[in-house]
Amino acid sequence: MKALLDLFKQVQQEEQFDAIKIGLASPEKIRSWSYGEVKKPETINYRTFKPERDGLFCAKIFGPIKDYECLCGKYKRLKHRGVICEKCGVEVTLAKVRRERMGHIELAAPTAHIWFLKSLPSRLGMVLDMTLRDIERVLYFEAFVVLEPGMTPLKKSQIMSEDDYLAKCDEYGEGEFVAMMGAEGIRELLRGIDIEKQIEQIRAELQATGSEAKIKKFAKRLKVLEAFQRSGIKPEWMILEVLPVLPPELRPLVPLDGGRFATSDLNDLYRRVINRNNRLKRLLELKAPEIIVRNEKRMLQEAVDSLLDNGRRGKAMTGANKRPLKSLAEMIKGKGGRFRQNLLGKRVDYSGRSVIVVGPTLKLHQCGLPKLMALELFKPFIFHKLETMGIATTIKAAKKEVESQTPVVWDILEEVIREHPVMLNRAPTLHRLGIQAFEPVLIEGKAIQLHPLVCAAFNADFDGDQMAVHVPLSLEAQMEARTLMLASNNVLFPANGDPSIVPSQDVVLGLYYTTRDKINGKGEGMTFADISEVIRAYENKEVELASRVNVRITEYELVDKDAEGDARFAPKITLQATTVGRAILSEILPKGLPFSVLNKPLKKKEISRLINTAFRKCGLRETVIFADKLLQSGFRLATRAGISIAIDDMLVPPAKEKIISEASAKVKEYDKQYMSGLVTDQERYNNVVDIWGAAGDQVGKAMMEQLQHEDVVDRNGNTVKQESFNSIYMMADSGARGSAAQIRQLAGMRGLMAKPDGSIIETPITANFREGLNVLQYFISTHGARKGLADTALKTANSGYLTRRLVDVTQDLVVVEDDCGTSNGVAMKALVEGGEVIEALRDRILGRVTVADVVNPETQETAIETGTLLDEDLVDLIDALGVDEVKVRTPLSCDTRYGLCGKCYGRDLGRGVLVNSGEAVGVIAAQSIGEPGTQLTMRTFHIGGAASRAAVASSVEAKATGTVRFTVTMRYVTNAKGELIVISRSGEALITDDHGRERERHKIPYGATLLVQDGQAIKAGTQLATWDALTRPIVSEYTGTTKFENVEEGVTVAKQMDEVTGLSTLVVIDAKRRTAATKGIRPQVKLLDANGQEVKIPGTDHSVTIGFQVGALITVKDGQQVHVGEVLARIPTESQKTRDITGGLPRVAELFEARSPKDAAVLAEVTGTTSFGKDTKGKQRLVITDLDGNAHEFLIAKEKQVLVHDGQVVNKGEMIVEGPADPHDILRLKGIEELAHYIVDEVQDVYRLQGVKINDKHIEVIVRQMLRRVQVADVGDTKFIPGEQVERSELLDENDRVIAEGKRPATYENLLLGITKASLSTDSFISAASFQETTRVLTEAAIMGKTDDLRGLKENVIVGRLIPAGTGLAYHRARKAREASERERAQAIADEEQSLFIEPPPVVQATTEGEGDNA
């Protein structure tokens, strides 16, 4: 019996563990793992194929080859389990122990572990405080290191060459000092380190020193030494005396046909080590000359190096075929390594894949599964059923039965499959909806049938896509698949909360066609009693589908809910003016939706909104049924509509010729201006591109207008316009296929094309596809089309990598509690840019939790309490009240440690309710941001390379009626013509309404001409200012006569003779292209007054000096009279490149990587008054004097645009030098909230440009993870080192502990880490190692003796536990609670026994002990 129980024990190794620790192994530890020493390099006997004794595959050390059978065959079968054969020394046990038993090699000379030597920064170097170069010279026998100086003047750990050593020996005598070479020397040095003493010394030096570099160096060394002290790891273990040998099954030797063997490279590497080791042993026994021994030791060191990490030092060892051998390090790192290949992504049983075809008759929760596939996938279930039914007695018989595919097997398959969901997955799985569960329906054929509505979520189409099927086996898995993953339970996108089951293409076309209305259709104006009458009339061809008629329609209104929570509806009959098609369609409306939602042409956006409304009003079940009905109706009606397209549907607008000839004339005009030198070539190009862009838009507009409307005669005989029934127009208008841009290419003009580098070719393609292109036009258009395809191929990889980094940084962020109780939040406003509302307030706060009461602005009463989740109805209320700012909770200010709380996150967008505890919101955020990235890269090539340019604004007009107000920063002067010229760079114009509330604000650029006054009342549509969009001016703020300085031709400026026009302009040349002597001087102009004195800045004795930037075209002459507001020079702006997501994806990556841009803006460090100090060479000195009178200096390169002027007051964090913002500066000067604003807005800009909706909270979640580390400023009484970077949660925990003891807590500064850096610096070394830089991460963790608490998802997947999210979180919590209660119980029992045994009579004691044994 006991043997049987032991058998089971072997199978179940369910050890529970809560953390994994990594460290360095001591030689004793390595020997304790080992089952014997490998002494010979042999592998297996090539005749008998049996492993050689004491060799690399020795059965005595590693275990038997066959289960329960020793090598010589003396002991076989189970009854001899555990016996060790006296003949061959092999233990009789399972063969799989060869996967876990290790051996060892006793090294004849110690060798250094290459990771601790060469992985930067060198750990050995840090501990010994020696340079890597020196240590390498010692290890590879090029130099001696002094161990014991004795009485000599030598220093400990001093390096000397061999000649030096001999000379010193002669000088001081043989035994006066000890010096060694090789790993032995280093080992002795390490042994001699007194860690405690070193730490004290370094701490003292840290206090004493003031130099930054030294502090950094000491802190690094201190960290390593303290880690050694804390973990109890001895530094000398970095030198190996015993080398462990990997179990043989993990480095297999596989016989190929033809008597050859395929072997793992590790065997070669081990063989080399053993050979060299044995040779060295022999040489030492023979007392060989020092030089030979030394050489052999060096070779041994090199062999061990290659085994551990081949190619890290020197040349990689190569095998017979000249390729480098794969070492142990390569086994674990990279995409094909242990982590990413076998631990994070495994192949699974019970799965299959096949092509998908459309299944229009399926319900949303079903998929069609080919019978043969199902038979294979559900085999074990069928076997079981066959046995229980008594048809087959054994598994073998059952197998036979299934293979013969008898009719009874098919019946059983039907039964087994019922109610058993399967999971379908389409690669690439970019977000949660890439795997969904369906109930299988058996079908003939070999292709999987997929429901059309889930295609959007899978991003699938039926042009040959394949999908994989997986079978959830256990009951729990089936339950989870059904409740959480069933397609009908996932109808919203987790990225933005929109419905994912929206019909597309022909369904949309059918619904649109049905719900269009037509003037004077057959039977217009008839009145019907009910819908069935309409259907009768339609079927008898009395009315057309689009005719306008009146129908009595029954609507169901929600009355209330009864006790069970089921809704009760009351019918309400009204006469509606509608069309035949809409009336017929109204039959499928779910109860609770009014008819008005259908009483309009259903375009794709409308249908999406309709499904969304249904979901919010009628619940999930009704919505799914409704979507299915919509689909069926759409298909049916599209078929009935019979829409097709012909070449005649592409109507070319008659105005096209005229528009094109006008544009050509304008272009010729610009060419003339260029010839006569009024404009530069760059300006001409910009203008030409603009003209053609506008012409293309005009043609497009004319074409759309013609397509859009047609003239018809109404009932009264009048001619009226109605929306056209042109097929192409209907397809584009309904959103079924095609876009205005594509139609423009068919029937308008193709327009401007882009070159592969993104610049626009200035000659447009004036033809369209209907007229056909000539050869030149075709050639130009191939450019763009090919670029689209090439881009797609290259960018998909980038996007996938971005997603990988995002997932890695957020994978451990899980909702762990319902409410953290914080009172912090962020004030949300509508996003307004250039007077347009880009994102309404309602969209930004929907699904968030309020953190302050929302107050009715009219009555000042509380409308919505704090802590309320804002749903659609409440958002409508806020809209109606006219509230323009709401303070809501955000993931950034959540106080939960090691996770998030539900209230700060708000609504789970994929489910439409408050987020559940255990939801892995980090991964969802990462997927929501990464998934569209891939989509965007693939979308480029559909337009076929036609250039899309953002039109340049050259004026700004008011959208609202109201009063103009200028901000305090707005400064302007009046020029000679009486125009107002803006001379501030950050001025804004506001429009306020009668109540003084701000309606819109507009930035007015430098050099613009203002057309309104401060305080002027204006009407909507009034122009506020105009400016030249193609150049930036430099404007004079004073009147006087110009006096040039350093404007020397050929030195600082070049005379650009335009070879075409023969005219010249002065252009400032780049300092980098000047000679060394003239680099520092900069061309500038001063102004002289009437007396010839320099004009001074009022209130100072600084002269007015206006510098010319690089590339500026100087428009004034020396000695010319200039007025205030006159233009002195123009700087041409760069020509436009086409903006698409290429600019986008790298931009998003750059934001999340928190890279400092080059030429970043300079922000004011303090609030104060600016002034200019003395210029140094090449730099200008800007001084800000703060309110206490302290001066802060900034040195700014002279070619930079300074945005402030003398005497201006600036606020902390305000931009003073133009340039892109540096996120690190924003965080430092303006705080977390501003930084989050900046990143969220910038990322959203990129996606918005592509029309992709992502909820802000996903980006905020990522920003939270980028901010999760802090830098310790003042240590207080905590265990940290100053300047150390630690997890915020860890620091707060430590502070709590210190405060509880009444000591001083540590203070810290926020740190912003890029996503890669944040992933690598996570506390979990398993997660970091599986991400990137595996070697470095593991080396560091081992030295630190790090413990991984398995908090994140990734670590748990790798060690094979349930992840602590979703149902796994509940499981882990229950397990921990159970363990705690068991511990308490054990403690209680122990205490009880303790109390019972105060004076125990001997008899009682004996019985108690006896019971203990029996129990």
Curated annotation (Swiss-Prot):
The keyword Iron-sulfur does not apply. It holds the Pfam family RNA_pol_Rpb1_2. The lineage of its organism: Bacteria, Pseudomonadati, Pseudomonadota, Betaproteobacteria, Burkholderiales. Residues 1382-1415 are annotated as: Disordered. Keywords: DNA-directed RNA polymerase, Magnesium, Metal-binding, Nucleotidyltransferase, Transcription, Transferase, Zinc. Belongs to the RNA polymerase beta' chain family. Mg(2+) binds at D461, D463, D465. This is DNA-directed RNA polymerase subunit beta'. The keyword Hydrolase does not apply. Gene3D superfamilies: 1.10.132.30, 1.10.150.390, 1.10.1790.20, 1.10.40.90, 2.40.40.20, 2.40.50.100, RNA polymerase II, clamp domain (4.10.860.120), RNA polymerase Rpb1, domain 3 (1.10.274.100). Its EC number is 2.7.7.6. DNA-dependent RNA polymerase catalyzes the transcription of DNA into RNA using the four ribonucleoside triphosphates as substrates. Binds 1 Mg(2+) ion per subunit. GO terms for cellular component: DNA-directed RNA polymerase complex. Its cofactor is Mg(2+); Zn(2+). The RNAP catalytic core consists of 2 alpha, 1 beta, 1 beta' and 1 omega subunit. When a sigma factor is associated with the core the holoenzyme is formed, which can initiate transcription. Zn(2+) 1 binds at C70, C72, C85, C88. It catalyses: RNA(n) + a ribonucleoside 5'-triphosphate = RNA(n+1) + diphosphate. Zn(2+) 2 binds at C820, C894, C901, C904. CDD domains: RNAP_beta'_C, RNAP_beta'_N. It comes from Cupriavidus pinatubonensis (strain JMP 134 / LMG 1197) (Cupriavidus necator (strain JMP 134)). GO terms for biological process: DNA-templated transcription. It is an enzyme of class 2 (transferase). InterPro entries: DNA-dir_RpoC_beta_prime, DNA-dir_RpoC_beta_prime_bact, RNA_pol_asu, RNA_pol_N, RNA_pol_Rpb1_1, RNA_pol_Rpb1_3, RNA_pol_Rpb1_3_sf, RNA_pol_Rpb1_4. GO terms for molecular function: DNA binding; DNA-directed RNA polymerase activity; magnesium ion binding; zinc ion binding.
